[in-house]
Regions:
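Short, surface-exposed beta-strand/strand-loop-strand elements in extracellular ectodomains
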Residues: 113-126
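Edge beta-strands of jelly-roll/beta-sandwich modules across compartments, strongly enriched
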Residues: 113-115, 157, 165-180
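N-terminal prepro-regions of secreted/extracellular proteins
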Residues: 1-90
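Noncatalytic modules at the cell exterior or secretory-pathway interfaces
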Residues: 101-103, 149-166
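Short, surface-exposed binding/anchoring microloops in extracellular/periplasmic proteins
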Residues: 78-115
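Solvent-exposed serine/threonine-rich low-complexity stretches and specific carbohydrate-binding patches
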Residues: 128-141
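Exposed aromatic-hydrophobic patches
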Residues: 142-150
Length: 181
């Protein structure tokens, strides 16, 4: 009986290992194919748009209280915005007479590394997202810039500031250049 246990236990272990490897062969094969570039599947493209770093200074004129939870002021064809401890906010509507707006902003946060801005067009009964207008700004305190073009000069738009968490707050400022009213 002792000799039988010595033979049976290693055989059972080998069978268990072979069964486990057999059930994993498709997964292992897919991993190897991906690593060697022979995969049949197409990887989803990352379409995240990041605002580009800029060394240009950011001046937010017309803001009475820069420590306000949220404040905005339209000055010299610019919409200047500060936010302190928000989850999300949206601006009032404005137009883009030249069909393009340039956004410069910065941010800091308690536990997230980015926040996002997106443009919405005013339509009957509400607002419609402007395709391709979402940009992410890192919350490292540095200034970042992006431009959104192809806008209808006769349409009204608003900007949404938000991030993908309700656990933490974001702090920062934005300057939206190229606006009217």
């Amino acid at each position: 009986m002792k000799n039988a246990k010595r033979v049976i236990i290693p055989v059972v272990i080998v069978l268990v290992v072979l069964l486990a490897l057999n059930s994993c062969k498709d997964t292992l094969g897919a991993v190897i194919d991906q690593a060697t570039g022979k995969a049949d599947t197409v990887q989803e493209e990352d379409t995240t748009q990041w605002a580009e770093p800029t060394s240009d200074p950011l001046s937010l004129e017309g803001i009475g209280d820069p420590s306000a939870k949220y404040a905005a002021a339209a000055v010299n064809s610019c919409l200047n915005i500060v936010f302190n401890g928000i989850w999300s906010r949206q601006t009032d509507y404005f137009t883009a007479p030249n069909g393009v707006i340039t956004i410069t902003g910065y941010g800091t946060a308690e536990g997230t590394q980015k926040y996002k801005i997106a443009l919405w067009r005013k339509v009957d009964g509400g607002a419609q997202y402007v395709d391709g207008s979402t940009y992410y700004i890192k919350t490292d305190g540095q200034n970042y810039r992006c431009s959104i073009g192809g806008l209808d000069p006769a349409a009204s738009y608003r900007l949404t500031i938000s991030y993908d968490s309700s656990r933490y707050y974001i702090y920062g400022g934005l300057k939206v250049e190229g606006i009217a009213g």
